[in-house]
Amino acid sequence: MRSLLLLAPLAWLLLVQAKDDAKLEDNLLVLTVATKETEGFRRFKRSAQFFNYKIQSLGLGEDWSVDGGPAAAGGGQKVRLLKKALEKHADKEDLVILFVDSYDVVFASGPRELLKKFQQAKSQVVFSAEEHIYPDRRLEAKYPTVPDGKRFLGSGGFIGYAPSLSKLVAEWEGQDSDSDQLFYTKIFLNPEKREQINISLDHRCRIFQNLDGALDEVVLKFEMGHVRARNLAYDTLPVVVHGNGPTKLQLNYLGNYIPRFWTFETGCTVCDEGLRSLKGIGDEALPTVLVGVFIEQPTPFLSLFFLRLLRLRYPQKQMRLFIHNQERHHKLQVEQFLAEHGSEYQSVKLVGPEVRMANADARNMGADLCRQDQTCTYYFSVDADVALTEPNSLRLLIEQNKNVIAPLMTRHGRLWSNFWGGLSADGYYARSEDYVDIVQGRRVGVWNVPYISNIYLIKGSALRAELQNVDLFHYSKLDSDMSFCANVRQQEVFMFLTNRHTFGHLLSLDNYQTTHLHNDLWEVFSNPEDWKEKYIHENYTKALAGKLVETPCPDVYWFPIFTEAACDELVEEMEHYGQWSLGDNKDNRIQGGYENVPTIDIHMNQITFEREWHKFLVEYIAPMTEKLYPGYYTRAQFDLAFVVRYKPDEQPSLMPHHDASTFTVNIALNRVGEDYEGGGCRFLRYNCSVRAPRKGWALLHPGRLTHYHEGLPTTKGTRYIAVSFVDP
């Protein structure tokens, strides 16, 4: 009982303290200037609402008198608006007013901490402090020296009692284009006025953190489900973070986290805010999308690109198509796609290589087609080196409801991606602290970034408003992608990147050859995922799991390996090369120049395909071999790999023989009954034949010693097989 009696006064004191704190917070008002609702302003409001700040915005709907908005040089308009707003608060002695910019400011903590730090400053007015003097460097000598901290006044944020702030701005009679910072600086540098109003600077960034001149000092601090900006130089946790001018990009980075928009405990807490759901909307009511396709250089797997475009789960009748093809190499592929599928789209516009339109001009044309059409709701720009493997990609991007958004795309096995997390001082790539985590999926969310490329979705309304008078793809001497991002940033439009889903990947174009008939066959090293999709049978993984492997003869295994495209292109490549052997024993292509069991064939090394074929054997045949012949390990070495051609009037069959291999792979490249009649393989020791080889299926059997075999006669048409003597 005595303990309870002792605790009662303590509880009463805590209750009184809480009431006093609440009363104190009620006497705090945040004033800011925002002439229009930009994305930066909405971010500011969201962080303020998170901490329950009371905000009053000044100047909404008013024209800004200086180009560049409220954060630009000038700023006298802000003083005028503040002076007028303070008229009704001038006699409120208990009212504390925080005045901050809004487009480039976020709150990192709440009113209680703000007011506590303000009271500890023991001043009537506290200004933010900066590393550099601005705008008049001649005034530097007049500034009081400080033993530790930032020396110079910053006008982007200050806090004070209402009567003192009224005195501060009472003398303002300048123009809207005059400098607010110079006005406040001259008052501060006047010792009499500084003492009369009782003005101090937040030298150690306890309240205000100006990022300009302090980028190396500020890091993110993750703590108990919250995120703060920490100043390493002074070991302080600022309440207000301000990133004006060139430091806006760093503020965008910090704003991805502060105050609790992404944490390690919660992940992204705001990714589902403001979504535009497309569920339940009929096809005819879906937004109209203009898809801009850009083929700017020789690109592998263009057929797959168009196939993935067709697979998008979005009605073609709500899509318009604009294609810029700069490459004659792809002219027939583009025309074939449009001939087969162009009528499925609402409209089609093609600019081919004969027009010779520059990359940037073509991209501007695509954006203009949407900008100038009020019915165009979205512009979806996609480069041909994008492998868009998620069929719901377009819907997912639309639902995220951002002005500009890109899906994360990376190159296979590399950190190369379609976004930059930061920019260097000269505007080029710089790796942000979170770049690798975002690329590798350890941090998942929707990220405000300074650079995107290759694929992005833009709202038509943004093209007709914030971006309406912008030559989007020209900027100084920059490439079109960097020009686009620089222009968008300049218009204060945020560019977002989402890695909430696996959308696809980027192709590597570095080593793409155009000297063959079917150049994609050579891409097994550079673009292995796409090579597999195009050339490896869809049921190969089932075969690897043992579900689709047949045994037509003892120790002879039969399983799917190649797609129709792989078979057809390999045959066409060989016929295009055309230098078939004569089918006699003399053969200068092999060591010794003598072939004991000759065929009419072309070796893989004759078409410079030996290295790629070995990669195929290692990646797809070796795993099957090791599964089917337990205890055997192979690196799939070979001396001979070739395509054989059988014709009734040329070489219809092959005599009984042993192969010079530990095991042999024999892949049927065309279809019995359609392309030829007869054919097959007979294993004499077992009196067992495979008479109807399936196109794209491989026969795998031991070579020397046990499996003595012959090629059965082809009686009509032409039969092709791909043969490899592995581990000779």
UniProtKB/Swiss-Prot annotation:
GO terms for molecular function: iron ion binding; L-ascorbic acid binding; procollagen-lysine 5-dioxygenase activity. Part of a complex composed of PLOD1, P3H3 and P3H4 that catalyzes hydroxylation of lysine residues in collagen alpha chains and is required for normal assembly and cross-linkling of collagen fibrils. Forms hydroxylysine residues in -Xaa-Lys-Gly- sequences in collagens. These hydroxylysines serve as sites of attachment for carbohydrate units and are essential for the stability of the intermolecular collagen cross-links. This is Procollagen-lysine,2-oxoglutarate 5-dioxygenase 1. Glycans are attached at N198, N539, N687. Homodimer. Identified in a complex with P3H3 and P3H4. It is a peripheral membrane protein. Disulfide bonds: none annotated. It comes from Mus musculus (Mouse). Its main location: endoplasmic reticulum. Its EC number is 1.14.11.4.
